[in-house]
Amino acid sequence: MNIFGVGLPEVTVILILALLIFGPKKLPELGKQLGKTLKSLKKASNEFQNEIDQVMKEEDKDESPKSIESNQSNEINQEKIDSENSNN
């Protein structure tokens, strides 16, 4: 078991310390709150990642026609240069 780089012995020590500090009555309440916090952080992280992915897809769609036009104009320019060089 390895959660966030913390193994089973470390988790055990953390749980024992939490039990001693907060007591057995508050521990379930703290666990629920920690779970809710982690869930909301994960949700926010997923939403942020989805927004980044969506922007990247939109940029790819916008970039595709430009890159095609750019490649075509580069090829035309290169053909002009090649024909000028062959004429000289």
Curated annotation (Swiss-Prot):
<keyword id="KW-0811">Translocation</keyword>
<feature type="region of interest" description="Disordered">
    <location>
        <begin position="56"/>
        <end position="88"/>
    </location>
</feature>
<keyword id="KW-0472">Membrane</keyword>
<keyword id="KW-1003">Cell membrane</keyword>
<comment type="similarity">
    <text>Belongs to the TatA/E family.</text>
</comment>
<feature type="transmembrane region" description="Helical">
    <location>
        <begin position="3"/>
        <end position="23"/>
    </location>
</feature>
<protein>
    <recommendedName>
        <fullName>Sec-independent protein translocase protein TatA</fullName>
    </recommendedName>
</protein>
<keyword id="KW-0813">Transport</keyword>
<feature type="compositionally biased region" description="Polar residues">
    <location>
        <begin position="67"/>
        <end position="76"/>
    </location>
</feature>
<comment type="subunit">
    <text>Forms a complex with TatC.</text>
</comment>
<keyword id="KW-0997">Cell inner membrane</keyword>
<dbReference type="GO" id="GO:0043953">
    <property type="term" value="P:protein transport by the Tat complex"/>
</dbReference>
<dbReference type="GO" id="GO:0033281">
    <property type="term" value="C:TAT protein transport complex"/>
</dbReference>
<feature type="compositionally biased region" description="Basic and acidic residues">
    <location>
        <begin position="77"/>
        <end position="88"/>
    </location>
</feature>
<dbReference type="Pfam" id="PF02416">
    <property type="entry name" value="TatA_B_E"/>
</dbReference>
<dbReference type="GO" id="GO:0008320">
    <property type="term" value="F:protein transmembrane transporter activity"/>
</dbReference>
<comment type="function">
    <text>Part of the twin-arginine translocation (Tat) system that transports large folded proteins containing a characteristic twin-arginine motif in their signal peptide across membranes. TatA could form the protein-conducting channel of the Tat system.</text>
</comment>
<feature type="compositionally biased region" description="Basic and acidic residues">
    <location>
        <begin position="56"/>
        <end position="66"/>
    </location>
</feature>
<dbReference type="InterPro" id="IPR006312">
    <property type="entry name" value="TatA/E"/>
</dbReference>
<keyword id="KW-1133">Transmembrane helix</keyword>
<keyword id="KW-0653">Protein transport</keyword>
<keyword id="KW-0812">Transmembrane</keyword>
<dbReference type="InterPro" id="IPR003369">
    <property type="entry name" value="TatA/B/E"/>
</dbReference>
